[in-house]
């Protein structure tokens, strides 16, 4: 079982976190959505190498006050935003004929498992529904609070928008966190 990382757009924040910290921990980098090489100087692989039971880490920026989109800031400063529908369709298209395999997806996007109100749905839950709808199989894990990369598969700061802000204030603006706990993650079966 292999861990693959996908940053759909050339986003300098995620490039630093995913490529420089996590990839030496035995991960493989998939090309950006436009097909460009994910990272020069590291093993870049193609989507047809993703097999059943592999882990596919999806890196994006969650939005602080919305569960309708995730985003990436490209090198030229433009921001690309994807809805759960667009994200699921992009994954499906990239996997091509391999889309029906059981894959362990991990969404690394701040507040990916948080909803805004008790009756709202998180981005992760919306993405899981869309992924199932386009025929993707396996599981999707998303995390509450702010997430980032550290060591192998991530770190977590707080478990909500409020506790994340309190943690940052308490540590004078520094994002300090720990490994995600079981109650900080939500898993959906696809």
Model regions and ranges:
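Active-site-proximal C-terminal subdomain of hydrolase catalytic domains
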Residues: 104-190
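Catalytic-core segments of thiol-dependent peptidases
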Residues: 2-117, 168-180
């Amino acid at each position: 079982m292999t861990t693959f990382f996908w940053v759909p757009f050339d986003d300098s924040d995620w490039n630093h976190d995913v490529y420089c910290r996590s990839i030496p921990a035995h991960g493989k980098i998939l090309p950006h959505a436009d097909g460009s090489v994910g990272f020069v100087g590291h093993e870049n692989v193609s989507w047809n190498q993703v097999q059943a039971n592999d882990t596919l880490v999806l890196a994006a920026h969650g939005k602080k006050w919305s569960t309708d989109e995730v985003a990436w800031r490209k090198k030229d400063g433009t921001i690309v935003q994807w809805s759960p529908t667009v994200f699921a369709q992009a994954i499906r298209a990239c996997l091509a004929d391999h889309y029906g395999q059981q894959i362990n997806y991990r969404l690394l996007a701040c507040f990916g498992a948080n909803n805004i109100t008790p009756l709202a749905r998180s981005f992760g839950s919306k993405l899981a529904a869309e992924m199932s709808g386009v025929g993707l199989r396996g599981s999707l894990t998303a995390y509450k609070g702010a997430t980032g990369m550290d060591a192998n598969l991530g770190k977590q700061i707080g478990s909500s928008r409020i506790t994340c802000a309190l943690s940052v204030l308490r540590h004078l603006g520094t994002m300090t966190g720990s490994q995600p706990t079981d109650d900080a993650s939500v898993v959906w079966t696809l």
